[in-house]
Amino acid sequence: MAFRGWRPPPPPLLLLLLWVTGQAAPVAGLGSDAELQIERRFVPDECPRTVRSGDFVRYHYVGTFPDGQKFDSSYDRDSTFNVFVGKGQLITGMDQALVGMCVNERRFVKIPPKLAYGNEGVSGVIPPNSVLHFDVLLMDIWNSEDQVQIHTYFKPPSCPRTIQVSDFVRYHYNGTFLDGTLFDSSHNRMKTYDTYVGIGWLIPGMDKGLLGMCVGEKRIITIPPFLAYGEDGDGKDIPGQASLVFDVALLDLHNPKDSISIENKVVPENCERISQSGDFLRYHYNGTLLDGTLFDSSYSRNRTFDTYIGQGYVIPGMDEGLLGVCIGEKRRIVVPPHLGYGEEGRGNIPGSAVLVFDIHVIDFHNPSDSISITSHYKPPDCSVLSKKGDYLKYHYNASLLDGTLLDSTWNLGKTYNIVLGSGQVVLGMDMGLREMCVGEKRTVIIPPHLGYGEAGVDGEVPGSAVLVFDIELLELVAGLPEGYMFIWNGEVSPNLFEEIDKDGNGEVLLEEFSEYIHAQVASGKGKLAPGFDAELIVKNMFTNQDRNGDGKVTAEEFKLKDQEAKHDEL
């Protein structure tokens, strides 16, 4: 509401209450019918202003003779009577009777003939020497010297910025006349009024009345008609010469020249790396409007918001605001609408809304990242280093970059055991355990593409999470050469088949084969690959020798590894 379109008022129209022939006679005589009588039938509790000579008023009235016969009424015309007081535009009695009235005050006025139409009357309407009774209700009052009146009844404790010329604002309002009659309300439309200030988009009084407001401030702006819709009104709901009262609550404020603003809330003391364009971030946020209204929160979904930055995956203001953050940092990012969701808005975000994001950076990485290894302790003798195929026993604590503990073997009371290079752990962990000696302690940081990827582990590891493992290697059993599951520690007997075939029937069954291999391992003559199921290894070795798959191995089928490279047995 409050569009431009006023013009200076023309000379007042003179209706019935003008004198007919010159000035009224001076006040004289005594008695109830000889003097002006005023009865104040209703006076409002609040009366910030009363009518003075020179003021312009709008009022309703009913005019009757002493016997009750009506001769005129503004209500019949469905329009107030609008006139200056004390400038000779009214009969003298009415000029005097209106002085001192409050808006919404009701007066019953008895005007003697000498202060009305005298001994001439008004032909066909008011007989000569008539006493006139007027029931008057004052609707509006203003003066040509008036300016916009501002009353602030709430101002937030913090007011970092106020409305300036050319700012764009979003506000709610109730628009009433001075008598309290509502003519318009943004609340009824459940939508703010959005406009530029000070560039002619509003009536002059509202342009002036909004200047200096803070977001969250509430003020009452009273505007005289010559700074509003003037003599003609708006042609719909606002009559001519009406003073307007706007009860305004400012929700939002920005300037088209604004960029984002950043307020650092918490910055970790140790910040080894800051985010750059192309990084992938995981962060929590609360998204609010400038007035504090929450429109979205990652916390309510119990899941971080995960995205690349600097590549257009998020609104431009967030793309910029997330650059240069540390892991664990908390900051507030204020995004003007032209760097947010623009004039259209999105979902429950209104158009032209300034957005406030309170973010907490959980982690970030770059797709080009490899693992990071920091060794905290190495024993004096650290000559035997882990390699592919070795069997390792180690303890670990697994956490996210923000310190959230995911898992711990210490809490479980047992080590984690793997064969290095066998695919038993994620690739980043496999890489991080290499070239480590027994007793060494190290921290391994694993980016998600070398960890559990975008999917994570349901209920355990978030998707796209960087993982931190604090590791202590407790035991290392050297593995076998690549491709071997069993090796001899010494010379191989030339009569190997005969030694396995104890019953000498020319064929070896699985039971005989398994018993022999385990005996060689027990005596130290042979070695099975550590970390694997021994029975499965032996069975696999036997199956490889059983060429025709009949469940037994003959001398013709039996061959050593170096005799046929494609098999991993013996």
UniProtKB/Swiss-Prot annotation:
GO terms for biological process: protein folding. It comes from the Eukaryota. Residues 1-24 form the signal peptide. One of its GO terms (cellular component) is endoplasmic reticulum. The gene is FKBP9. A motif (Prevents secretion from ER) lies at residues 567-570. Inhibited by FK506. Ca(2+) 1 binds at residues 501, 503, 505, 507, 512. InterPro entries: EF-hand-dom_pair, EF_Hand_1_Ca_BS, EF_hand_dom, FKBP-like_isomerase, PPIase_dom_sf, PPIase_FKBP_dom. Residues 54-142, 166-254, 278-365, 389-477 form the PPIase FKBP-type domain. This is Peptidyl-prolyl cis-trans isomerase FKBP9. Its EC number is 5.2.1.8. Glycans are attached at residues 174, 286, 302, 397. The keyword Phosphoprotein applies. Phosphorylated. Residues 488-523, 533-568 form the EF-hand domain. PANTHER family: PEPTIDYL-PROLYL CIS-TRANS ISOMERASE FKBP9 (PTHR46046:SF2), PEPTIDYLPROLYL ISOMERASE (PTHR46046). It catalyses: [protein]-peptidylproline (omega=180) = [protein]-peptidylproline (omega=0). It is found in: Endoplasmic reticulum. Ca(2+) 2 binds at residues 546, 548, 550, 552, 557. CDD domains: EFh. PPIases accelerate the folding of proteins during protein synthesis. GO terms for molecular function: calcium ion binding; peptidyl-prolyl cis-trans isomerase activity.
